[in-house]
Regions:
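C-terminal transmembrane helix and the adjacent membrane-cytosol boundary/short C-terminal tail
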Residues: 21, 99, 163, 167, ...
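Periplasmic/extracellular loop-to-transmembrane helix junction in inner-membrane transport proteins
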Residues: 5-25, 42-84, 105, 248-257
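Transmembrane alpha-helical segments of polytopic membrane transport and secretion proteins
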Residues: 1-30, 277-290
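Transmembrane-helix boundary motif in ABC transporter permease subunits
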Residues: 84-116, 277-286
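Interhelical loop and adjacent transmembrane-helix boundary motif
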Residues: 61-68, 218-268
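Membrane-cytosol interface at the C-terminal ends of specific transmembrane alpha-helices
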Residues: 93-106, 110-113, 139-192, 202-207
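Hydrophobic alpha-helical transmembrane segments of multipass integral membrane proteins
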Residues: 75, 79-87, 91, 95, ...
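Generic hydrophobic transmembrane alpha-helix motif, especially the helices
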Residues: 117-153
């Protein structure tokens, strides 16, 4: 009998029932997940957006004048993001380049990669304790102590992400550049890094999202102050970021309207950060294909 004459095997009734059950379960799980996400986003926005005013965004809190403002918290968040990225990007990218392009001891490289994976899974409150002992006890509670703590937290992520991006560059590109007489560093600078810049940039943007949403690592290191300072003065003094301020207003002061307003702002910022990462990746992919 030829292939055309063969009939497709009929599924048994129990088999069809099983497949329908699995398919229905997957659809139900997807629907519940989507509904829960929409409920959380909608609830936070409904509770938070009406409380977002220009006065809230542009003033400092004052107990004497019975005024609430989050301008210092916004500035502190910007300061700590900039300070963290200024340290963690050179360390993470440079370390990844060394491990991928220069290191010859594979056991050492494997040990470092394993340590980076392990550090990525440590709860952030432990980093807060480490940061307090290493930085706050020596330089005092300050945004700089919090930024250095966040550097330790985000370094493994940027290191491993950059490593994986470097490995996507074909070895033939390196060999071709070497064949043209280029040196090691010139090959890395002109061939390897441009070939994986999309992954590196995306990893850095996503790290901004993690820094933005971090609170536990800053509780014992950055402090709770709400004072407007310049960049360098701000790094040397204690200050609350938006996430820490959210905790303070909700837990300590019972200002749930302000807490939901901050939550809505953070949610929008997180969405914009993830959207930026997606757009950057898509742009580099189009450039590479075109």
């Amino acid at each position: 009998m030829n292939a055309k004459g063969q009939k497709k095997p009929m599924l048994s009734k129990s088999r069809r029932l099983f497949l329908w059950t699995v398919r229905g379960g997957m659809w139900l799980a997807a629907a519940l997940t989507g509904a829960l996400a929409l409920f959380i986003v909608g609830y936070v926005l409904i509770r938070g957006v009406p409380n977002i005013t220009w006065e809230l965004l542009n003033t400092s809190p004052s107990y004497l004048e019975d005024r609430i403002g989050i301008l210092p918290d916004i500035l502190n968040t910007i300061y700590i993001i900039l300070a963290t990225l200024a340290v963690v990007i050179p360390l993470g990218v440079g370390g990844a380049v060394y491990l991928t392009e220069y290191a010859t001891n594979r056991r050492l490289v494997g040990a470092i990669e394993y340590a980076a994976e392990a550090l990525s899974g440590i709860p952030s409150i432990i980093y807060s304790l480490v940061g307090m002992l290493m930085f706050s006890n020596n330089m005092g509670t300050s945004l700089m102590a919090g930024a250095l703590t966040l550097v330790i937290m985000n370094l493994p992520t940027i290191l491993r992400n950059t490593q994986e991006s470097l490995k996507t560059v074909p070895q033939s590109y390196r060999e071709g550049a070497f064949g043209l007489g280029a040196g090691k560093w010139r090959v890395i600078r002109t061939v390897v890094l441009p070939g994986c810049v999309d992954g590196v940039v995306t990893g850095c943007i996503l790290s901004v999202g993690r820094i933005l949403g971090e609170s536990a690592a800053l509780l014992f290191t950055a402090g709770f102050a709400h004072a407007v300072n310049g960049f360098f003065d701000g790094l040397g003094s204690a200050g609350a970021t938006l996430t820490v301020a959210l905790y303070v207003y909700a837990k300590e002061q019972g200002e749930f309207g302000v807490a939901f307003a901050i939550a809505a702002i953070l949610m929008v910022l997180a969405f914009l950060i993830n959207l930026s990462a997606s757009l950057v990746t898509r742009k580099f992919h189009r450039k590479a294909e075109g």
